[in-house]
Amino acid sequence: MNNKAVIAMSGGVDSSVAAYLMKQRGFDCIGVTMKLFANEDIGISREHSCCSLDDVEVARSVAYSLDMPYYVFNFSDRFETDVIDRFINAYENGITPNPCIDCNRYLKFDKLYMRAKELDRDYVVTGHYARVEKDGNGRFLLKKALDDTKDQSYVLYCLTQEQLSHTIFPLGEMRKSQAREIAESQGFINARKADSQDICFVQNGSYADFIEQYTGKNYPDGDFLDTNGNIIGRHKGVIRYTVGQRKGLGISAPEPLYVKAVNPVSNTVTLSYNDGLYSSIVKAGDINLISVPEIKGEMRVKAKVRYRHTEQWATVTQNGDTITAVFDEPQRAVTCGQALVLYDWDTVVGGGTIIEVK
């Protein structure tokens, strides 16, 4: 392999420091920002966002300060079909997606990687907090970042062996505070920029408003049901609800009520008390295994069912292109559409998209 790399630059501090570190290692680098929005109003600049027009200028400034060529690649068509359309389709079908995983899978480590190869560059470099290592058998492993509070391995479980072999995460061995110190020492204008928090194409965290505006559809009101199927109120459209949600229900009850299930076919949302949200068996499809080629028999792992979830012990089995995890303890508000990611301590075994919960 050569020492030529493409640095995916979002305009944030992490990707900027990743670029600096790669230059320090002697790599021949070019900086790239992916243009994701054909309609710039979708990616409008706002606090805690990424990939807006302002972010392009920040990334360009950092690349210039590092004496590094910089380009903007237009991936807006692919972003629309593989991220936004999938996001909307999921909510319309009562599923809660993770668009960051789709963006990594279809853009950063697929489309951008393909473009890097066309440019005769062997590596894609990002500012993710994770690590890639090679085991004694020549298999590439995805590992958690040393800074567990910033670890992003959950949203990277979809990387293949080929992609991992051409990926570098320079920040995997450091803490966020160290990254900011480097950015300040280099005079980067984004050194104190806040971390991105929300979905990049959703303003003010209102994903339902985004879906209505983007599609031009009106999603009709329907019935709230209790767990016995009795009507207990009216909801404002199924796209506004996800499993475990409490806010915005507008229902009075002796105890707090939460969303237990969303059924777009009947246009109903089932509510339950907190103790009705727990489940122990989680099945996932569209799987990708990293540390092993397949799971034979039963495997003891720690597993996560959402990004901000602490891994919990489970026994996992594989059946063709699906995996099933049986948790030692029931887990709260497990949601179809999110990822089930398996860990062998700090190593990602693999994962998949949750398709069934019991």
Q: What are these language model-derived features?
A:
Residues G127-E133, R139-K358:
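AMP-forming adenylation/ATP pyrophosphatase catalytic core
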Residues M1-Y157, I168, S177-Q178, E184:
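ATP-dependent adenylation/nucleotidyltransferase module used to activate substrates
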